Design a protein with these regions (language model features):
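Extreme N-terminal tail/first-helix region
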Residues: 1-22
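Charged, gly/pro-rich active-site loop segments
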Residues: 1-5, 88-152
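Structural motif corresponding to alpha-helix initiation and N-cap regions
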Residues: 7-8, 63-64, 122
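Amphipathic alpha-helical interface surfaces
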Residues: 10, 66-72, 92, 104-108
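A generic structural signal for nonpolar/aromatic side chains embedded in well-ordered alpha-helices
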Residues: 14, 69-70, 112, 139
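Alpha-helix boundary recognition
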Residues: 14-18, 71-72, 130
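Short beta-strand segments
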Residues: 19-62, 68-70, 76-80, 89-91
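Short secondary-structure boundary segments
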Residues: 81-83, 141-142
Length: 152
């Protein structure tokens, strides 16, 4: 039966495999929305009163539209959905923080690569994407809307 997800269900949905691609909305300089696909990982170590599921972490090149947008305007929204019955989704609104720290960048690029491409390709993905010019982005949730089993 359709129901609103609790925080643990949200975290499990975001971490489930096979990994789903998120749809990230950022704000262009002229105020128009920009939506782009992102691979992400959930950092449960950041769970707390101000982040009940933890931060959503992804990387992007600083020169991309989303990279430029979020360094200027940190408000973001991310939607992750299940496109097969019984259909579920999580939408997260929040604020981004950006880092260019090389160790953090390599770590998260490797984690994300393993999540989407498999453990055997994680290091290669990390080495290719954990480089200067890339950003580590942490989306700290301020609002989460999530429903499970919508077609039941």
């Amino acid at each position: 039966m359709a129901h609103a997800m609790d925080d643990e269900e949200v975290a499990e949905f975001l971490e489930s495999l096979p990994a789903r691609t998120g749809k990230l909305a950022s704000v262009r300089a002229d105020g128009r929305p920009h939506v782009a696909p992102v691979w992400y990982a959930l950092d449960r170590s950041t769970r707390g009163p101000d982040s009940p599921v933890g931060d959503i972490v992804f990387n992007t090149a600083s020169a991309t539209v989303k990279g430029r947008n979020l360094t200027r305007e940190p408000r973001l929204a991310l939607c992750v959905d299940d496109d097969a019955p019984p259909f579920s989704f999580v939408t997260i609104e929040g604020t981004a923080t950006v880092s260019e720290d090389p160790d953090e960048l390599l770590h998260w690029a490797t984690v994300i690569g393993g999540r989407y491409m498999g453990a055997d390709q994680a290091d290669a993905y990390g080495a290719r994407n954990g480089v200067p010019g890339e950003l580590v982005v942490r989306l700290r949730p301020t609002r989460i809307t999530a429903s499970a089993r919508l077609a039941d």
